[in-house]
């Protein structure tokens, strides 16, 4: 695929609802809404070449929808034109919020990358939950505000290469799990997505808990997911078909297996595959020059695909690959090592995430920015 351009910017960066041509709110002109677009898109012109509606007062391209008061009350402005929208889906136990927090932390440590967390929600989330992550406690599900509008955790990551700017935006929204079709179908960001990441909990793979116990590997008890991972991919496909038809097939899908530290601790990894939780990392997808190693990436992806097939997730793999033209697989650990659990007492590992950025490296390569 070539570089992804989102033009015109036709959705609200907070609720991801489609913005009508003549009804939007300009945050630079507070109190003067709805604004009137000065350029009307021509339906006979291909989407990529239509004029973008501008604020008639200040000419800004930053637009927020008028359908939700909470959108207009947000001050932590997310980049108006993200280079790519990445939707992250999965069951509640897959750790989506933890994953997002660790991605932000990882980007913050990279040289030449500007990370601006303009939302107090990110700081509050870190203060309230980071120590719980380090203690391997089970976090509460992300909650909605009283006004029923999701809290937004956003950051800007601008990486310059060849005079190009790459902007990644992350939002964390509550209760948006993939096992309920009705709920999934209402996720507007899924239909704005240029890429989709589906997180799977290793401990919820069929028979995995029993396999770990057979090898005397203890793990924190968690509520079992009532439905199979196959339901998640079915619902994602169903929602995309409902909203986008055949266009949804072109969205690259990444399937990530979370909590891989347990697989390494139990010596369940494919031969020669290790992300470094219990030894040397043999699967780095970036070469010595910081470029994506396609050969290594494809090898890793095939090994994780085979791992899922061998652990009774063949239907999930087959359904994903029948619908999506591009499917990639990866394994990661937000903790970096499995916690020690004895007599119900959890001894936390050093918090050192591993391979959480792999799909983002692929995405940046896809956009010719890596």
Please give the residue ranges for each predicted region.
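Flexible phosphate/Mg2+-sensing switch loops adjacent to catalytic phosphate-binding sites
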Residues: 76, 108-144
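Beta-strand-loop-alpha "switch" segments that mediate conformational coupling across diverse proteins
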Residues: 318-340
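Long, basic/Gly/Ser/Thr-rich N-terminal segments
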Residues: 1-80
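Hydrophobic anchor at the beta1->P-loop junction of P-loop NTPases
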Residues: 86-88
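Conserved C-terminal guanine-recognition region of P-loop GTPase G domains, centered on the G4
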Residues: 186-288, 300-322
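Switch II of P-loop NTPase G domains
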Residues: 146-197, 203-211
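Conserved glycine(s) of the Walker
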Residues: 94-96
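A conserved segment at the C-terminal end of the G1
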Residues: 98-109
């Amino acid at each position: 695929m070539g570089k992804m351009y989102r033009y015109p910017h036709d959705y609200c960066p907070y609720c991801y609802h489609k913005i009508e041509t003549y009804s939007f709110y300009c945050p630079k002109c507070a109190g003067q809404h709805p604004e009137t677009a000065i350029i009307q898109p021509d339906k006979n012109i291909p989407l990529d070449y239509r004029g973008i509606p501008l604020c008639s007062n200040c000419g800004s391209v930053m637009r927020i929808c008028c359908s939700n008061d909470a959108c207009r009350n947000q001050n932590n402005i997310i980049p108006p034109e993200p280079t790519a929208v990445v939707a992250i889906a999965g069951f509640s136990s897959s750790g989506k919020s933890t994953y997002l927090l660790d991605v932000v932390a990882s980007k913050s440590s990279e040289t030449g990358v500007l990370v601006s967390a303009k939302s107090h929600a990110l700081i509050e989330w870190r203060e309230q939950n980071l120590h719980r992550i380090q203690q391997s406690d089970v976090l509460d599900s992300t909650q909605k505000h009283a006004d029923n509008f999701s809290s937004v955790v956003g950051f800007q990551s601008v990486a310059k290469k060849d005079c190009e700017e790459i902007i990644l935006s992350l939002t964390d929204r509550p209760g948006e799990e993939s096992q309920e079709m009705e709920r999934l179908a209402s996720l507007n960001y899924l239909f704005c997505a240029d890429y989709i990441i589906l997180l799977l909990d290793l401990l919820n793979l069929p028979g995995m808990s029993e396999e770990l116990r057979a090898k005397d590997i203890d793990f924190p008890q968690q509520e079992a997911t009532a439905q199979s991972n196959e339901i998640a991919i079915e619902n994602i496909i169903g929602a995309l078909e409902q909203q986008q038809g055949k266009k949804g097939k072109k969205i690259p899908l990444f399937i990530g297996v979370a909590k891989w530290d347990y697989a390494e601790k139990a010596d369940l990894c494919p031969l020669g595959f290790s992300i470094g939780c219990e030894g040397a990392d043999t699967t780095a997808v970036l070469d010595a020059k910081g470029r994506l190693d396609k050969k290594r990436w494809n090898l890793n992806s095939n090994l994780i695909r085979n791992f899922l097939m061998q652990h009774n997730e063949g239907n999930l793999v087959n359904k994903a690959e029948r619908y999506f033209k591009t499917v990639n697989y990866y394994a990661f650990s937000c903790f970096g090592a499995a916690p020690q659990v004895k007599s119900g007492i959890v001894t936390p590992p050093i918090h050192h995430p591993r391979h959480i950025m792999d799909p983002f490296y692929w995405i940046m390569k896809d956009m010719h920015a890596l």
